[in-house]
Design a protein with these regions (language model features):
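Multi-pass alpha-helical transmembrane bundle typical of ion/small-solute transporters
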Residues: 1-327
Length: 327
């Protein structure tokens, strides 16, 4: 059990440094914030966001897979986490902003299929696959419309003054984005830790304990401060060149989508998918060629591969762990 908790917190930490760039890349790219100031702010807001709810944790822990209450089920959870961490590290190494959230869910599905557990496919479709498709589309369209409205509203204003104003505003939109990341992503680790406590027989109901919330929040904040510079560069510069108004529009859109899905639908969506699609949406208001679609294509490929590849690695981890009699 201790090993599962430690590995879960390690996943949370890697989630922090892997996804930290999502919250702050646009602000750093537009020079609204210095990298160090952005990282400190993102770490603090991630910490706060983790305390805002447990609805997503309930979905991840009880709505995706069903495992029997047995020590063997702890091995499934451990393998799921190892599969997710492995895929996170692979995509981080290559600078691809794949989704830590979907890596975790892919890991849970893969390890469960390799064992005697049951995958709740209706829950996977409703809470994972549909939001996985819808949230980037909504992010793209809303960001495009918001940026179009901003361009119209400030069409006669002095560009220099507009940029300065939005550069200041970006401090707030980046904070909102980081808060949304903490709200969404810390809960996923809370959900897995609580799942482990339930299947291990340490608690009977699926109630997220206060110490689980504190540990998940702290691990995510620490990982966020460690930073993710490779991915920050991909999001902030390689997809599209951003100015402060576009950075503000992208962050505001992404934060709104994160809050809505967490509080209203309790759906574990990807922070990465959401902000990347929003960045593409604001970039498309310049002209479609302003978005570097080749880079966007690489990112989409990584998205599509995340769930099956993390699942495959998790299944392999499960089979390897079962070779040890003590497990």
């Amino acid at each position: 059990m201790v090993a599962v908790i430690v590995v879960a917190l390690s996943f949370d930490y890697t989630n922090g440094f892997h996804d930290a760039a999502n919250a702050i890349a646009t602000s750093v790219s537009t020079r609204a914030l210095t990298p160090r100031a952005a990282l400190i702010m993102a770490a603090l807001m991630n910490l706060l966001g983790a305390f805002l709810g447990t609805g997503v944790a309930q979905t991840v822990g009880s709505g995706i897979v069903e495992l029997p209450e047995a020590t063997a089920s702890l091995v499934v959870v451990l393998a799921a986490l190892l599969g997710a961490i492995s895929w996170n590290l692979i995509t981080w190494w290559f600078g691809l902003p794949s989704s830590s959230s979907h890596a975790l869910i892919g890991g849970l599905i893969g390890a469960t299929l390799a064992s005697v557990g049951i995958v709740k496919w209706a829950g996977v479709v409703e809470k994972v696959l549909i939001p996985m498709v819808v949230s980037p589309v909504v992010g793209f369209l809303v960001a495009y419309l918001l940026m179009t409205a901003i361009l119209w509203a400030f069409r006669r204003a002095n560009p220099g003054r507009v940029n300065r104003g939005f550069r200041i505003s970006q401090s707030f939109s980046a904070a909102a984005m980081a808060l949304g990341h903490g709200l969404q992503d810390a809960q996923k680790t809370m959900g897995v830790m609580t799942l482990a406590l339930v299947v291990g027989g340490y608690q009977s109901d699926f109630e997220v304990q206060w110490w689980v919330i504190v540990l998940a929040a702290a691990a995510l904040a620490a990982g966020t401060y460690a930073g993710g510079w490779r991915i920050m560069r991909t999001l902030g510069r390689r997809i599209v060149h951003l100015d402060p108004p576009r950075g503000f529009a992208a962050e505001t859109t992404a934060a709104s989508v994160l809050y809505t899905t967490a509080f209203v639908f309790h759906a574990p969506i990807s922070t990465t998918h959401t902000i990347t699609s929003a960045v593409m949406g604001v970039g498309a208001t310049k002209r479609l060629s302003a978005v570097r679609w080749g880079v966007a294509g690489d990112i989409v490929t990584a998205w599509v591969l995340t769930i099956p590849m993390a699942g495959l690695v998790a299944a392999l981890c499960y089979w390897v762990l079962r070779l040890f009699p003590a497990l």
